[in-house]
Curated annotation (Swiss-Prot):
It comes from the Bacteria. GO terms for biological process: positive regulation of translation. One of its GO terms (cellular component) is plasma membrane. The gene is lepA. GO terms for molecular function: GTP binding; GTPase activity; guanosine tetraphosphate binding; ribosome binding; translation elongation factor activity. Required for accurate and efficient protein synthesis under certain stress conditions. May act as a fidelity factor of the translation reaction, by catalyzing a one-codon backward translocation of tRNAs on improperly translocated ribosomes. Back-translocation proceeds from a post-translocation (POST) complex to a pre-translocation (PRE) complex, thus giving elongation factor G a second chance to translocate the tRNAs correctly. Binds to ribosomes in a GTP-dependent manner. GTP binds at residues 14-19, 131-134. The keyword Acyltransferase does not apply. This is Elongation factor 4. Keywords: Cell inner membrane, Cell membrane, GTP-binding, Hydrolase, Membrane, Nucleotide-binding, Protein biosynthesis. It comes from Burkholderia thailandensis (strain ATCC 700388 / DSM 13276 / CCUG 48851 / CIP 106301 / E264).
Length: 597
């Protein structure tokens, strides 16, 4: 066991984490040159395209060190984005060490810091690495100063490397072996294995990626999952050297996979503990929690007959993404669809994109909303994640909205514009610190304000230099109201929005104006109104299209013309009573886009 090292790589988006992983795998001969492609561990097309890591992956590598000993290195690739922070904490708790990769030309960024603090809290040894030192803009001294200043770990002897050219990658591994302690654990104790990740394979069912903490596991043994108490019999165990390789057994300190004929992914929850069914461990490993979705949106098929196909696609996605939640819902305007819960905005975009790309779905997505806590006048508290489910204003005692703590990092030139943005978003400043040229701002901002377009706006006011991460803090009483949109006096549920009272007039007017542009003219007048409860706050009219009924009367008597006009008016009136206004798809998307222009 002294020769095993379990480590993961922490880095901000684009600081070269996956490239470094590629180089390490190449150096240890995990794949032949023919099979080597860039970003080996990012197996989803989407991960490659966006250059982000979504699911955790592992590689068990052998490395002959300079002292002649052969070490087993287990690389656990973690997602770097804040939406997947629970997956990150699980991956990190399976390691004893983490390589902190910092781009020498850019210095420390927000997500790096967030994940690094997680690592330090979990007691993981952090080894700083400066990447991209081959760039002309690289400034290693500055980056070292930032690591020490912001994160507070000693970085004087940080390894310098360039993952692109392969320069210094061996030094990274040597430094890893020297600094990271070998795993502790007893191969003869009762089995305890932490599930780092799980996914569904069409041939063998659910594959669980685990780190064995204590004990030994062999095929044909009975195992039990401690969160659900479900029992299964093990078919295969093994490791990934990115390719899978079956082994006789997995013992304490190793990272590998278990295949046990599990049919649904919900049984194998990330962070759960696997143990033997008979000689089971007295207690599960700490840190397991159910992941709660933070952001909700409705997904509807563009064609109503695609509903079943959408349900199947969601079921298949759920096999690989246990944090996705969905339930069927019906909207008067959009027909049948699903209300889906996501970890955050990036997660939502990825799910949408995967549905469109892998399953060929055409989707309409309603505006993302967060979960509000509503205390009713009879004292009961309900959680509302859909504006249509919000009770009538008379029955509400108070509404509490989720508040998140946001950490922002940016060069000092952009502090002013970022502060202005946070103020617009009803943020309260908690803290502000200068680290060299970088500034760290801490704000408390309502989650609803972040969900819409905070991230995009932040990138645009700071020219892409600011980075952020957020975590949920608490529910706080707030003056939020539900704005309904009425078309000819009928509520359109899919267009309802929940906003702060201070912005309700403005937003109501804006949505109404937008709808006027988008809804095509009908044969009769259409009134678009925005209302809070029974109180109308904005109105727009769409004028009717009319045929020129007087075209055939040259000259002639005025009463004849009047008769024809009256007749037309009557017809329009009748039409208006029976007609229903077609609302085009763009109207729903427009709601998303009016957010704070």
């Amino acid at each position: 066991m002294d020769h095993i090292r379990n480590f993961s790589i922490i880095a901000h988006i684009d600081h070269g984490k996956s490239t470094l992983a590629d180089r390490i795998i190449q150096l240890c001969g995990g794949l032949s040159d023919r099979e080597m492609e860039s970003q080996v561990l990012d197996s989803m097309d989407l991960e490659r395209e966006r250059g982000i890591t979504i699911k955790a992956q592992t590689a068990a590598l052998t490395y002959r060190a300079r002292d002649g000993k052969v070490y087993n290195l287990n690389l656990i690739d973690t997602p770097g984005h804040v939406d997947f922070s629970y997956e990150v904490s699980r991956s990190l708790s399976a390691c004893e060490g983490a390589l902190l990769v910092v781009d020498a030309s850019q210095g420390v960024e927000a997500q790096t810091v967030a994940n690094c603090y997680t690592a330090i809290e979990l007691g993981v040894e952090v080894v700083p690495v400066l990447n991209k030192i081959d760039l002309p803009a690289a400034n290693p001294e500055n980056a070292i100063a930032e690591i020490e200043d912001v994160i507070g770990i000693d970085a004087m002897d940080a390894v310098r490397c360039s993952a692109k050219t392969g320069l210094g990658v061996e030094d990274v591994l040597e430094s890893l072996i020297a600094k990271v302690p070998p795993p502790k654990g007893d191969p003869d104790a009762p089995l305890q294995a932490l599930i780092i990740d799980s996914w569904f394979d069409n041939y063998v069912g659910v594959v669980m990626l685990v780190r064995i903490v204590n004990g030994t596991l062999r095929p044909k043994e009975k195992i039990k999952l401690m969160a659900t108490d479900a029992q299964y019999s093990v078919e295969h165990v093994g490791v990934f050297t990115p390719k899978s390789r079956n082994l006789e057994s997995l013992s304490a300190g190793q990272v590998g996979f278990i295949i046990a004929g599990i049919k649904e992914l919900t049984a194998a929850k990330v962070g759960d503990t696997v143990t033997h069914a008979t000689k089971s461990a007295p207690e599960p490993l700490p840190g397991f929690k159910e992941v709660k979705p933070q952001v909700f949106a409705g997904l509807y098929p563009v064609e109503a007959n695609q509903y079943d196909a959408l349900r199947e696609s969601l079921e298949k996605l759920k096999l690989n993404d246990a944090s996705l939640q969905y339930e069927p819902e019906v909207s008067q305007a959009l027909g049948f669809g699903f209300r889906c819960g996501f970890l955050g905005l990036l997660h939502m975009e990825i799910v949408q994109e995967r549905l469109e790309r892998e399953f060929d779905m055409d989707l309409i997505t309603t505006a993302p909303t967060v979960v509000y806590e509503v205390v009713q006048s009879d004292g009961a508290t309900i959680m509302v994640e859909n504006p249509a489910k919000m009770p009538e204003p008379a029955r509400i005692a108070e509404i509490r909205e989720p508040i998140v703590t946001v950490n922002l990092y940016m060069p000092q030139d952009y502090v002013g514009s970022v502060i202005t943005l946070c103020e617009q978003k009803r943020g309260t400043q908690i803290n502000m610190q200068y680290h060299g040229r970088q500034v760290q701002l801490t704000y408390e901002i309502p989650m609803a304000e972040i969900v819409l377009d905070f991230f995009d706006r932040l990138k645009s006011v700071s020219r892409g230099y600011a980075s952020m991460d957020y975590e949920f803090k608490e529910y706080r009483t707030s003056d939020v109201v539900k704005v309904d949109m009425l078309i000819n006096g009928d509520k359109v549920d899919a267009l309802s929005i929940i906003v702060h009272r201070s912005q309700s007039q403005y937003r109501g007017r804006e949505v109404a104006a937008k709808m006027r542009e988008i809804i095509p003219r009908q044969m009769y007048d259409v009134a678009i109104q925005a209302a809070i409860g029974a109180h109308i706050i904005a109105r727009e009219n769409i004028k009717a299209l009319r045929k020129n009924v007087l075209a055939k009367c040259y000259g002639g008597d005025i009463t004849r013309k009047k008769k024809l006009l009256e007749k037309q008016k009557e017809g329009k009136k009748r039409m208006k009573q029976v007609g229903s206004v077609e609302i085009p798809q763009e109207a729903f998307l427009a709601i998303l886009r009016v957010e704070d222009k």
